């Protein structure tokens, strides 16, 4: 590609294989830890234009590549950060540190304390640079870091604050705002703020159309925010949005990438919403080998979402072997020691228990799931678990649980609570 050619010209050559890329990432990560984030501050007038151009080129490549091929994006980001530190121009250093914050937690929640320290360092440098937009970017990247490990409330606060500051001071920074808006919308689903999601997704889409911003349009229509149309009870619109983007940017022969994952997630959710469990499971299983080989499952959110999607689709299907598929999904989620993964795993355990014929045990498993999901700050999922428990209990107590859950969903502008519950 043109970007790869430009990078080769400055001595940055992407490896030919995913394995070699991972080795290079680890090597660069060790080099960065040994080097640290210290730098000698310099102003633009002190710097050769070529060196500044090289840092800007790497920023441009890594900021886009990170959301197409995260493994390659991580490598380019490490090149970018080390060169920005060597350059010493405060604004570029702060931006490179901010982007690194998100990368640090993308594959490991254990890195979160280091990511917080990196965010504090980025904020310090951004303040020294006196750049309000970059301060907002640092806040937003901190929110992205929280999103990637399932800290939904904190992610909501930080991304909202970052968006506000970037919009107020963002001359020429539209891409960073676009990306933050996409993750902010995705986070609203997990926060249970569905009314706000249904309000903002069409609004952001109209704004993107008005300014001719194709990247933002595609992200809202076909990525995680696509679920907003299911909140509104419009599965046909949700499908049309996703398929239109897929047709405009269809397969070009390249390996399975993040766009393909987003298409899988959105369309499987639509399958579940309309009650096509067999179609949902077939869709996930058809894509699974490519998903695994892409190494996207190294990204924690993709890993958790994918295994939960697999298990949910299996529970909704009529396949004779569905119990084995659910067990596989439960085992996959058990490997990730995150509160939200534990809560989603508990939902699958309850579903499997019911499938095996024990309503009483399934109801008890749902109580455990509610507790775990509440601890993970996932009120939507708590309400769906409560609704399911009400259906199992029956009688006046069960009816009260069902009615309370349905009222909560209606208050969140969910047009069809019963259909929406199938997603979870």
Segments predicted by a language model, with ranges:
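Structural motif corresponding to the intra-repeat A-B loop/turn of tetratricopeptide repeats
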Residues: 68, 87, 107-109, 149, ...
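Amphipathic alpha-helical segments of tetratricopeptide repeats
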Residues: 4-15, 81-85, 120-130, 160-171, ...
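Hydrophobic, small-residue-rich alpha-helical packing segments that form membrane-like cores
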Residues: 107-210
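Residue at a conserved register position within TPR or TPR-like alpha-solenoid repeats
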Residues: 65, 97, 104-105, 139, ...
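Non-membrane alpha-helical segments in proteins
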Residues: 53-68, 78-82, 94-108, 137-148
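Amphipathic helix-loop-helix modules that constitute alpha-helical solenoid scaffolds
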Residues: 1-75, 106-117, 154, 174-178, ...
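"A position-specific structural signal for the A-helix of alpha-solenoid helical repeats
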Residues: 56, 60, 99, 134, ...
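Generic long, charged, amphipathic alpha-helical segments
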Residues: 322-385
